[in-house]
């Protein structure tokens, strides 16, 4: 996997496909070694996809130091430099959507268009669910909580009434968990991401974004709640809004 260096870390990245350049920014703990990833999606069949392990994840360095969303955006710009991209269409999912906002604000000339999926603006627009507050729960309690946060149709009441199906879903989630979190710095990297996520706030600055934008959300998502997604959308002039039944 190719690597590029910034002033303080080495970043591993991957690029595949042909067509218009698309920078993909994934969620907390994203690891390019985990399968399936973005390259298994239809995107890779139609675009030149570039993505990378954000600091603290995957094969990228994992410094135990506080980091802001703006710094994560600087890392993204550095990866674009590594492949000689002046600009690209940017797709950000969840945490990656927050990084994408900072990239569009801090490096406007480098973002051709913006797709923000299940993410939030923070501040007066509302924030995504504070996942960092779940660290005190047992693994079993946290898994049940995350099931409900991910889709409100599987809330606590539903779980109580559907114990067998709940256990099946929890086992499936455990089977899909990253096998790389036990590596040195794995948990620390995610902790630092969640810290940055908890301070994310672009709400008042978003009107400065003047490029084509699409904001997407899930109707039953409790992590990036529909009202939070709508608030984000309302701050970007002429942005499109789309909700999925999930």
For each predicted feature, which ranges?
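Conserved HGGG/HGGXW glycine-rich cap/lid loop of the alpha/beta-hydrolase fold
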Residues: 5-65
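Residue in the alpha/beta-hydrolase core beta-strand immediately N-terminal to the catalytic nucleophile
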Residues: 89, 112-115, 207
């Amino acid at each position: 996997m190719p690597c590029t260096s910034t002033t303080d870390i080495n970043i591993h990245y991957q690029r595949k496909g042909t067509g218009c350049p698309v920078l993909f920014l994934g969620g907390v703990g994203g690891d390019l070694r985990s399968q399936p990833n973005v390259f298994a999606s239809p995107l890779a069949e139609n675009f030149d996809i570039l993505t990378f392990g954000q600091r603290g994840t995957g094969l990228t360095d994992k410094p135990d130091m506080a980091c802001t969303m703006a710094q994560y955006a600087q890392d993204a710009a550095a990866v674009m430099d590594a492949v000689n991209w002046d600009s690209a269409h940017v797709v950000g999912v969840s945490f990656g959507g927050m990084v994408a906002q900072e990239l569009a604000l801090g490096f406007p000339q480098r973002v051709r268009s913006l797709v923000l999926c299940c993410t939030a603006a923070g501040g007066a627009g509302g924030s995504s669910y504070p996942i960092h507050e779940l660290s005190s729960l047992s693994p079993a309690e946290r898994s049940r909580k995350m099931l409900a946060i991910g889709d409100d149709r599987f809330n606590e009441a539903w779980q109580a009434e559907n114990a067998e199906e709940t256990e099946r879903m929890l086992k499936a989630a455990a089977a899909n968990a990253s096998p790389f979190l036990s590596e040195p710095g794995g948990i620390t990297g995610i902790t630092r991401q969640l810290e940055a996520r908890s301070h994310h706030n672009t709400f008042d600055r978003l009107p400065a974004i003047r490029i084509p934008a699409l904001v997407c959300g899930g109707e039953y998502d409790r992590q990036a709640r529909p009202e939070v997604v709508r608030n984000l959308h309302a701050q970007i002039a002429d942005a499109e809004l789309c909700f999925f039944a999930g």
